[in-house]
A protein has these predicted regions:
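Rhodanese-like catalytic fold shared by cysteine-dependent sulfurtransferases
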Residues: 2-8, 18-38, 44, 51, ...
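Non-catalytic accessory regions used for complex assembly or targeting
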Residues: 12-14
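Hydrophobic beta-strand scaffold positions of dinucleotide-using enzymes
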Residues: 53-55
Length: 133
């Protein structure tokens, strides 16, 4: 009887550990992006050095005004361009669009592609800081 109890306990522990591993994503990598505020994104831009800003809008929207140093990778091109233009999958990547919808889609796609440090901060319509044209 003690052996059966011991086996059941070991089985439950094993299943629990397996479940935790499955939830953490492939190889323990992040399985989601972090949503932050515009203020938090600005703080990162002011204090960090090693980050990339992705504008997930269209070329026309980008030309109307964008956050300084942002690179344009429209949300619908992330799959095709990320590997080439974003070779470091652990790089801090900040993502925005116009309202937040496309930046969420782009951030989800980046995570699916294996990027582990993605932060989405919504849309430029809520960006209270300077932009460049």
């Amino acid at each position: 009887m003690k052996k059966v109890k011991g086996l059941i306990i070991m089985l439950l522990i094993s299943l629990s550990l397996f479940g935790m591993t499955a939830c953490s994503g492939e190889n323990g990598k992040a399985s989601t992006y972090e949503q932050i505020t515009a203020e938090q994104a600005k703080t990162i831009m002011d204090t960090e050095k090693d980050y990339i800003i992705i504008d997930a809008r269209t070329k026309e929207e980008f030309a109307e005004g964008h956050i300084e140093n942002a690179i344009l990778i429209p949300e619908y091109e992330i799959k095709d361009r990320a590997e080439k233009e974003l070779p470091d999958k652990e790089q801090l990547i900040l993502v925005y669009c116009r309202s937040g919808r496309r930046s969420k889609i782009a951030s989800e796609e980046l995570v699916k592609l294996g990027y582990t440090n993605v932060k989405e901060f919504g849309g430029i319509i809520d960006w209270p800081y300077d932009i460049v044209k």
